[in-house]
A protein has these predicted regions:
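Rossmann-fold NAD(P)-binding glycine/threonine-rich loop
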Residues: 110-131
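Conserved small/polar residues in nucleotide/adenosyl-binding loops
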Residues: 287-291
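Rossmann-like NAD(P)H-binding beta-loop-alpha module
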Residues: 132-194, 205-206
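Substrate-binding/catalytic subdomain of NAD(P)-dependent oxidoreductase enzymes
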Residues: 184-281, 286
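ADP-ribose/adenylate-binding Rossmann-like module
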Residues: 99-115
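Short, ordered loop/turn segments at secondary-structure junctions
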Residues: 50-52, 110-112, 118, 136-138
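N-terminal glycine-/serine-/threonine-rich beta1-alpha1-beta2 phosphate-ribose binding loop
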Residues: 2-101
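Short catalytic-loop micro-motif centered on adjacent basic/acidic residues
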Residues: 82-83, 105-108, 131-134, 158
Length: 291
């Protein structure tokens, strides 16, 4: 295919914070790698921000920066919108407006997907567009699309996984090195593996939102993460780890959801003792894994 015939996929992005800046850099640096896979060149046409001056310093071409959402929503050339704003609003309204405008939407916003996923998916279906949220669950592990494909042929009865890398890092270090929770959390923060305010991770809220998304998917109904029993790892001590090791087990923070008759669900996030024959026993440090 000649350069004249080369197809261009034009993208709009909502937000240019930490995640958005990362997406921008990937799109800029991976053009050659993406071209043979997509059969097209990707062009980031517009980025919606609040602070133009701050955002302009992060990009090569400041003309792609805008404070007007309508510039993205009303641009017929923009086929895909990447939402990296975070939070529920105005992200929710923007996503719905983009779908109604005939654009496909990609997000990693697990808070929004967990609470409003059903409504957004309905809007996507109504408009014949894709709403993709693979990155909102289990990071780099492609779990959402395989679940969709499995659901076409059969019903999934149960899903269990380690869905938060920060807590798994902490528990692995506590298990292998005999370190305290506070000491490992501090190390994780210094290494950039954990936020300064790590409540969402260590209290299990992040994993809870993710299992809510997966529960909604396997059941076909909206599952609110507030309705799921959630217990984090802040109360786990060095003594607990020694006790688990003496029993030939290790402690992992598991998120689990199981379907019962009548499409009833039981979902839970809690620390569990696993024996070596458990498929998640050897998932260590920052790795996450569904099973």
């Amino acid at each position: 295919m000649s350069m004249a015939e080369e197809r261009v996929i034009k993208i709009g992005m909502l937000g240019l914070g930490t995640v958005g800046t990362g997406v921008y850099k990937v799109l800029k640096s991976q053009q050659e790698e993406m071209l043979p896979k997509l059969g097209a060149r990707v062009e980031l046409k517009k980025i919606l921000v609040r602070n133009v001056e701050k955002a302009a310093a992060k990009v090569d071409d400041p003309s792609i920066i805008t404070t007007s959402f309508e510039e993205i929503a009303n641009d017929p050339e923009i086929e895909i919108v990447v939402e990296v704003m975070g939070g529920k609003q105005p992200a929710m309204n923007y996503i719905l407006a983009c779908l109604d405008a005939g654009k496909n939407v990609v997000t990693a916003n697990k808070d929004l997907v967990a609470s409003e996923g059903k409504k957004i998916l309905a809007a996507a279906k109504r408009n014949g567009k894709d709403f993709l949220y693979e990155a909102s669950v289990a990071g780099g592990i492609p779990i959402i699309r395989p679940l969709y494909e499995c659901l076409m042929g059969e019903q999934i009865q149960e899903i269990t996984g380690i869905l938060n890398g920060t807590t798994n890092f902490i528990l692995t270090k506590m298990d292998k090195e005999g370190a305290s929770f506070d000491a490992v959390l501090k190390e994780a923060q210094e290494l950039g593996y954990a936020e300064r305010n790590s409540e969402a991770d260590v209290e299990g809220y992040d994993a809870c939102r993710k299992i809510a998304i997966l529960s909604s998917l396997i059941s076909g109904q909206q599952v609110d993460f507030e309705d799921i029993y959630c217990e984090g790892i802040t109360e786990i001590t060095v003594e607990d780890m020694k006790y688990a090791k003496a029993m030939g087990t290790t402690i992992k923070l598991l998120a689990s959801s199981r379907r019962y008759a009548g499409n009833r669900l039981h979902a839970i996030v809690a620390p569990c003792m696993l024996y070596p024959d458990h498929p998640l026993y050897n998932v260590c440090l920052l790795y996450t894994s569904p099973s």
